Design a protein with these regions (language model features):
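Extreme N-terminal starter segment of soluble prokaryotic enzymes
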Residues: 1-3
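Catalytic domains of carbohydrate-active enzymes that cleave complex glycans
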Residues: 314-317
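Aromatic-lined carbohydrate-binding surfaces of glycoside hydrolases
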Residues: 6-219
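Catalytic-core regions of glycoside hydrolase
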Residues: 62, 145-149, 157-312
Length: 317
C-alpha cells in the first residue's frame, strides 16, 4: 500500500512573478498570491527536506512525489532553472538517499496550463511544435534521472479560465486539443515503460467523455479536501465512479483543510474501492518546502501516520 507525500522542489506552479490583478483582490486572495507568485529563486530548504524525510520514514510512509518544476537545472533546457535550482548531480544524490530510507521517489511535472509557470517561456508556447519538443525532452531527462520510476505524475488539473483568473496570461485547451496533448504526454511517459499518473479533475465536468477516452493504464488521483463524505457530493462520487469503471486509484487528501480530511479519505475509500484497485493514498499541503511552513509539513505527516494506523485496524478487523 502506497503512503505518499507530495513535496515541492520547485514552486512556480501558479501566477507569474509580476501578476498584480486589477480586481478581485480581497485580503485572503492577496495572502495566497503572496505565497503562490513565481519567484526567480528556489524556495526550498534542504534542512527541512531532510527533516520531512526522517518524519516520513518514522511515520511509515513509503513514497515521496517530487514536484520538480523549476527546481532542477535540466541539462536539456537549463533556461528553465532559477537561482538555486539543483544540478542533476545533486538530484541523483538526493534520490539515492531517499531510496536508502525505504522511500520511493516519484517525479511530477505538471503540464496543466494552470500550473505550468515553471516552464518559463514555454508556458506561452502551449500546443506548438516547440512546446511538444520541450515536454518530450523534459520527460526523457526526468525518467532517466529517476532511473525509470514506477510512476510519473503529469498533473493536468484545474485547466480552466476561472482557475487562471489572477494570472496575467491564461490559456485553456479544450475538446480534442486537450485530449491530443494529454495523450502525447502519456505516450512520452509510457515510452520509458513508466506508468502515467494524473489528477482526475476532468471527470468532475465531463464524466461521459472521461470514461470514453481516459486509458485504464493511467493512475487516477481524485482529490477532495472536505470533511463530509457522501455520494451526493460530486467530488466524492468521483471515487465511486472511478471504481465502478475499473480504474486504479491513489486518493488524495489535504492537511490544510482540516485534520479530519485525510483520515476520512482513507476511511471512505477503503470501504468503497476494491483493494485490487486501491493503490494507496497521497497527502498534500500545497506550500513551499521552507522553514515558515515547517509546522504544517510535519503536521501533515503526523496525520498520515494516524491514517496508516486506521487503515491497518480496518483491514485486520
Amino acid at each position: 500500500m502506497i503512503w505518499a507525500n507530495l513535496i515541492h522542489l520547485g514552486f512556480n506552479m501558479w501566477e507569474e512573478h509580476d501578476a498584480k490583478p486589477l480586481y478581485g483582490m480581497e485580503s485572503r486572495i492577496k495572502k495566497i498570491l503572496n505565497i503562490r507568485r513565481a519567484q526567480p529563486y528556489l524556495r526550498f530548504d534542504e534542512e527541512l527536506w531532510n527533516e520531512i524525510l526522517a518524519h516520513m520514514k518514522k511515520a511509515g510512509m513509503n513514497m515521496v512525489v517530487v514536484d520538480i518544476g523549476e527546481g532542477l537545472q535540466y541539462e536539456s533546457h537549463p533556461e528553465i532553472a532559477v537561482k538555486g535550482s539543483w544540478t542533476t548531480k545533486k538530484l541523483k544524490k538526493e534520490l539515492k538517499k531517499v531510496r536508502s530510507m525505504g522511500i520511493e521517489p516519484i517525479p511530477k511535472l505538471n503540464f496543466s496550463t494552470m500550473h505550468d509557470t515553471w516552464l518559463g517561456p514555454y508556458s506561452r508556447c502551449v500546443s506548438t511544435d516547440t512546446y511538444y519538443n520541450v515536454c518530450r525532452d523534459l520527460i526523457d531527462e526526468v525518467c532517466c534521472l529517476f532511473e525509470k520510476p514506477r510512476f510519473f505524475h503529469l498533473g493536468m488539473d484545474e485547466e480552466t479560465a476561472n482557475h487562471q483568473c489572477f494570472s496575467l496570461y491564461a490559456v485553456v485547451r479544450q475538446h480534442h486539443l486537450w485530449w491530443h496533448d494529454f495523450y502525447f504526454l502519456v505516450d512520452e511517459v509510457e515510452r520509458h515503460n513508466v506508468r502515467a499518473w494524473v489528477w482526475s479533475d476532468y471527470l468532475w465536468y465531463h464524466p461521459d467523455i472521461f470514461f470514453k477516452k481516459m486509458p485504464k493504464t493511467v493512475v487516477q488521483s481524485n482529490w477532495y479536501y472536505g470533511k463530509i463524505f457522501n455520494k451526493n457530493i460530486n467530488y466524492v462520487k468521483a471515487y465511486l465512479d472511478l471504481e465502478n469503471h475499473g480504474y486504479d486509484q491513489i486518493p488524495t487528501g489535504n492537511s490544510r483543510s482540516g485534520k479530519e480530511n485525510f483520515i476520512r479519505t482513507v476511511s471512505y475509500c477503503t470501504s468503497h474501492i476494491s483493494q485490487k484497485r486501491l493503490l494507496g493514498f497521497l497527502q498534500t499541503i500545497w506550500l513551499p518546502t521552507t522553514k515558515p511552513f515547517r509546522k504544517k509539513h510535519l503536521e501533515a505527516i503526523k496525520i498520515v501516520s494516524k491514517g496508516i494506523r486506521y487503515f491497518h485496524r480496518e483491514i485486520n478487523e
